[in-house]
């Protein structure tokens, strides 16, 4: 075997057969992590607030779940509860986190949950903890020009987040910072993934917050689109990114997970191309000002590790098809389509 090939093989050495703890296993991203980990041969221990809740039933139907998936009831704010879940695991994917702009519900639970997972990981001597942070911890800085590429060295301005009452971004930033501090103190190998807005097929039966972002343009509830931009990434790519940074010994630090940024006008154009039968808005709510320029997010670090991103158009198409297949979005009949077009 050539030296380069041997080195590559060693770098991505098979670690299937290991047990990975996935927190908040029933969530949108976490469900995909569980699915892909099982497909790769891992044993998965998923933490949930209530494993018996019907909304988590999809996990038990995943391929390999019967043999290699255990769902455990865990309160992430109870350190002993977290320790029990992590004990005996080789790695942890910490994905569970509140998604809210209520500061009391967002900040403290996110910070304490992250700390508890790192402490539990240290005690269990796990090989690596992979923490799902967010682009919200990275790009909120009024002093950074939109023309400057946002990369892993960037952090959100906490005072700006507080001033604008963006408690989601504030909570994500302080939770990630706390995770880094505790990991350093406890000697835990921590790697962080910072995804942008995540879309793609739903595995869970409920609609998640990011999917509502698309749904409103298809149901007719949004009559116009905003003069705003958003970066997108496929949920499968986010799950793969976590597995990649867990498996690659050389992975370290933070990894921005973004495919591309679109203006809302570009977003609705793609939706209208694939799904012309829906009442997708064609006018911007702000036609006086020039189009807002999108942020430029670097995804070089993940690409260098070998991640191939799914094109945003494919991601949007699969998101809508999933909403249709699960009954969250009705499919208009021909008469409705003609009415929309006229």
From Swiss-Prot:
Cytoplasm among keywords = yes
Per its record, the protein catalyses: (E)-coniferaldehyde + NADP(+) + CoA = (E)-feruloyl-CoA + NADPH + H(+); (E)-4-coumaraldehyde + NADP(+) + CoA = (E)-4-coumaroyl-CoA + NADPH + H(+); (E)-sinapaldehyde + NADP(+) + CoA = (E)-sinapoyl-CoA + NADPH + H(+); (E)-cinnamaldehyde + NADP(+) + CoA = (E)-cinnamoyl-CoA + NADPH + H(+)
User: Single Gene Ontology BP term?
Assistant: phenylpropanoid biosynthetic process
**Pathway(s):** Aromatic compound metabolism; phenylpropanoid biosynthesis
What does gene deletion cause? Answer: Drastically reduced growth and lignin content, as well as death after flowering.
Q: Which GO terms describe its cellular component?
A: cytoplasm
- What's an example of a GO molecular-function annotation for this chain? cinnamoyl-CoA reductase activity
Q: Where in the cell is it found?
A: Cytoplasm
* Post-translational modifications: The formation of a reversible disulfide bond reduces activity by perturbing the positioning of nearby catalytic residues.
Tell me, in one coarse class, where this protein mainly resides. cytoplasm
Q: Which domain of life is it from?
A: Eukaryota
- Protein role: Involved in the latter stages of lignin biosynthesis. Catalyzes one of the last steps of monolignol biosynthesis, the conversion of cinnamoyl-CoAs into their corresponding cinnamaldehydes. Mediates the conversion of feruloyl-CoA to coniferylaldehyde. Also active, with a lower efficiency, toward coumaroyl-CoA, caffeoyl CoA and sinapoyl-CoA. Involved in the production of floral volatile phenylpropanoids in flowers of fragrant cultivars from cinnamic acid, a common precursor with the anthocyanin biosynthesis pathway involved in flower pigmentation.
Q: Which family does it belong to?
A: Belongs to the NAD(P)-dependent epimerase/dehydratase family. Dihydroflavonol-4-reductase subfamily.
Q: What protein is this chain from?
A: Cinnamoyl-CoA reductase 1
Q: Which organism is it from?
A: Medicago truncatula (Barrel medic)
């Amino acid at each position: 075997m050539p030296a380069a090939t041997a080195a590559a093989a060693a770098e991505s050495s098979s670690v299937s057969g290991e047990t990975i703890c996935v927190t908040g296993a029933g969530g949108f991203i976490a469900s995909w992590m569980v699915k892909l980990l099982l497909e790769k041969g891992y044993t998965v221990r998923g933490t949930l607030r209530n494993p018996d809740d019907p909304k988590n039933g999809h996990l038990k139907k995943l391929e390999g779940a019967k043999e290699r998936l255990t769902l455990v009831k865990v309160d992430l704010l109870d350190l002993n509860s977290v320790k029990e879940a992590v004990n005996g695991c080789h790695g942890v994917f910490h994905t569970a986190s509140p998604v809210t702009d209520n500061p009391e519900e967002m900040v403290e639970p996110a910070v304490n949950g992250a700390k508890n997972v790192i402490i539990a990981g240290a005690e269990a001597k796990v090989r690596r903890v992979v923490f799902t942070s967010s682009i919200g911890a990275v790009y909120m800085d009024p002093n950074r020009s939109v023309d400057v590429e946002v990369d892993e060295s960037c952090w959100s301005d906490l005072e700006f987040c507080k001033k604008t009452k963006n408690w989601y971004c504030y909570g994500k930033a302080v939770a990630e910072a706390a995770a880094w501090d505790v990991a350093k103190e406890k000697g835990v190998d921590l790697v962080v993934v910072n995804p942008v807005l995540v879309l793609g097929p739903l595995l869970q039966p409920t609609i998640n917050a990011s999917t509502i972002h698309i749904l409103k343009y298809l149901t007719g509830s949004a009559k116009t689109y905003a003069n705003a931009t958003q970066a997108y990434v496929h949920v499968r790519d986010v799950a793969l990114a976590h597995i990649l940074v867990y498996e690659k010994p050389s992975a370290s630090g933070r990894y921005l997970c973004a495919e591309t940024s679109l203006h809302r006008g570009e977003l609705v154009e793609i939706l209208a191309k694939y799904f012309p039968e829906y009442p997708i808005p064609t006018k911007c709510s702000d036609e006086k000002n020039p189009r807002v320029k999108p942020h430029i997010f670097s995804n070089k670090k993940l690409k260098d590790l070998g991640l191939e991103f799914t094109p945003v158009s494919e991601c949007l198409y699969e998101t809508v098809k999933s909403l249709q297949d699960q009954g969250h979005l009705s499919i208009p009949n021909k008469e409705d389509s003609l009415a929309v077009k006229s």
